[in-house]
């Protein structure tokens, strides 16, 4: 038994300069796991609650000392003496201790940090990498793959201070044979895009996730400069590299309309889906995330009907990594993919359940970071250990993003051919 002998919580900083919760779980035998909770900017209304202190005299109210006290107090007391390898049991203890639907008593940030730290400690006690331990928890031991990265190289929306409405424009190096090659391709395109923007007299400052954030005349212009960069870098758009969007449409949904203030256009629900389809007809866009508001289920049905057979339609704010909401989506044929974010649901066990449910229904699962990150690279191990096939972890700069890519490089080196990189086959509608 990997007996828990101590649980420690502390307040640390995330990549946006805001506090977050870090936890350590100590086991008999000297094994220790440490993990930190990430934090989102564009958040779904049904996400598990990130507990903040609200004390304006500290960190402008964003402190997490209450959540940290919960880790060092009731959570620690409840977990002492328990077996760290019994992940589902540990997570259930914390969920029951909280007793709320959205973890607003103890805080999803407190519960998640401990949940992930326990998994890391358990892996250490077993003498195996975290991805291997996750595969065992997932009921898929030894089944691995390297994820296709969705690299967020141009930012708008809530992730940038510019006039571009769509939140993320991403490249996917689907033509690569290995993850290492995919990363190189993405980096070359990123640096080429910087030159393209600079030569046009556009800003090369970066947003929260490391993508460039220039002011552009339209969302189509963003796709055009990316196309130019891909081709200048020596790659073929549509073959070597495909495109993906995260609209984060809930952020510009007002009074039943989709208001693209940056380019002065307003759409009704079906009109915005038609607009996205027109972009996908012009460019090789193979994945669109949150293409409509989280509450616009009729609109999602239409979007799935007109694009779902050829394009991966990813629910982020729509599903918030929640199996209850995902069940409704599956039953109604809404979207065909789910974005997976640990902190939307608040524990490793519930995260794995969402991935399993998606896969069993023929939906893809895209593992994702948040805009507020730390050096914690657990999502890299999650992507490989569940053979999810896709990962979103930002651009090719900022160490909080690159930490995940570097961990994937290490894992690929360890696993070799046991973790294939399958490219386009991983993306819904493209196999």
From Swiss-Prot:
Give the UniProt subcellular location, in the record's own words: Cytoplasm; Secreted; Cell surface
Q: What class of enzyme is it?
A: lyase
* Molecular function (Gene Ontology), one example: phosphopyruvate hydratase activity
Domain of life (superkingdom): Bacteria
Residues binding Mg(2+) are: 246, 289, 316
Pathway, per record: Carbohydrate degradation; glycolysis; pyruvate from D-glyceraldehyde 3-phosphate: step 4/5
Q: What's the cofactor? A: Mg(2+)
Reactions this protein catalyses: (2R)-2-phosphoglycerate = phosphoenolpyruvate + H2O
Spell out the Pfam families in the cross-references.
Enolase_C (PF00113), Enolase_N (PF03952)
Catalytic site positions: 209, 341
Q: What is its EC number?
A: 4.2.1.11
Q: Which GO terms describe its biological process?
A: glycolytic process
| InterPro entries xref list | Enolase, Enolase-like_C_sf, Enolase-like_N, Enolase_C, Enolase_CS, Enolase_N
Q: Where is it predominantly found?
A: cytoplasm
Q: How is the cofactor bound?
A: Binds a second Mg(2+) ion via substrate during catalysis.
Q: Where does (2R)-2-phosphoglycerate bind?
A: 167, 341, 370-371, 392
* Classification via NCBIfam families: eno
Q: How does it assemble?
A: Component of the RNA degradosome, a multiprotein complex involved in RNA processing and mRNA degradation.
Provide the family line.
Belongs to the enolase family.
The protein's job, in short, is: Catalyzes the reversible conversion of 2-phosphoglycerate (2-PG) into phosphoenolpyruvate (PEP). It is essential for the degradation of carbohydrates via glycolysis.
Query: What is the name of the protein in this document?
Result: Enolase
